Amino acid sequence: ALKVSMKDIADYLGGLPEAKMHCSVMGQEALEAAIYWYRGIPLATHDDDDEGALVCSCFGISESKIRRVILESSH
């Protein structure tokens, strides 16, 4: 389950409009967080550094992480 990507999630849903691709990013992060929690593995927290603005405090998702995932998925 940790190998499920945001693209896998979007594909499973029959595709997502570009404006909603962030939803699959959040879905992938939520799945990863749930697996880590189930296994008792602590999640890394977001520190105020060069990671950019914190977008999702529940999962510690920064703006730069979302941008990175979008760039990776566009290849």
UniProtKB/Swiss-Prot annotation:
Transmembrane segments: none annotated. InterPro entries: NIF_FeS_clus_asmbl_NifU_N. The lineage of its organism: Bacteria, Bacillati, Cyanobacteriota, Cyanophyceae, Nostocales. This is Nitrogen fixation protein NifU. The gene is nifU. SUPFAM superfamilies: SufE/NifU. One of its GO terms (biological process) is nitrogen fixation. May be involved in the formation or repair of [Fe-S] clusters present in iron-sulfur proteins. Gene3D superfamilies: 3.90.1010.10. Belongs to the NifU family.
